[in-house]
Amino acid sequence: MNPYHSYVSELARLVREGRGFPLGGFPIPPRPAIRSNTPPALIFSPHPDDECIIGGLALRLMREAGMRVINVAVTQGSNKARQVARLAELKDACDYLGFELLQTAAQGLENINVKARADGALAWQASVEIIASILAEHRPSVIFFPHDTDWNSTHIGTHYLLVDALARQSPEFACHVVETEFWGAMATPNLMVESSVTDLADMMTALSFHVGEVQRNPYHLLVPAWMQDNVRRGGELVGGQGGAAPDFVFCTLYRLQRWSGGQLQAILKGGRSLPMSVNVATLFAASPGERARE
């Protein structure tokens, strides 16, 4: 018997079965001890659900390093009829993962896109000020936001929203910047972060709390396949063309830099792979003025 036929058949069977799995309502898993007196990580999520998809590194920071993780709901989606429900789903998803949640406005920010930015709309400037205030108040050690070609207009808009908000910080403000990808793949990621089966399963479970979204499109079932494709891409994009691929099954790709002195600065020489066997805290062990090494 051809084993590859069985392999593909099992994948197809699991996806079909997964469509009947419960959505949300799962008991909260054990929580790690959190170091409340240290700067947090902030995830600037363009939409409710992004925190569950690109949050592999953030989840490891919380579970391995005891870091507070705050998910900032940049928008609550474009469908006004769903914004209240999406916030409720987001609260449940964040609670399941152990992330804190911060709203930007009663129903989230609106028109977060490059057109609003180019038009110089007052609403855009007001949105930038909201994000700038969040950065100044929380003084995060790490922030997550999409890269500048992440295809979706709100994802790209969120990138520039953060760029503009960072530019409004005081000269001494510094933090690590982790650019994320989902809709559009990064051409130059420099960080490949492995996720365990447990972490990925918990992220999928949290994603299932976004009931209204996954009912219309069960994309939560395809996150493992996306993470497997990240292993394929990351093996060469991060590890180097023709290099040996890391022994990962699931991973997420990021671009890690540092905001310091009013600008983004490269801190990795080449790329870095972070397996589950290495504590994620080592990734940010360098002092603010020190360039991280592989």
What are these regions (language model features)?
Residues F26, V128, I143, V178-T180, ...:
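Sparse, context-dependent recognition of short Cys/His-centered cofactor- or disulfide-binding micro-motifs
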Residues P171-H176, F182-W183, L200:
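Active-site cores that bind ATP or allylic diphosphates and position pyrophosphate for catalysis
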Residues G184, P189-T252:
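A conserved mid-domain beta-alpha-beta active-site/ligand-binding segment of alpha/beta enzyme cores
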Residues A245-L268:
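Acidic, Ser/Thr-rich low-complexity intrinsically disordered segments
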Residues A58, Q107, Y160, E179, ...:
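Flexible domain-boundary/linker segments
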Residues M1-F173, A185-M186, T205-F209, G261, ...:
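Active-site beta-strand->loop->alpha-helix modules in alpha/beta enzyme cores, enriched
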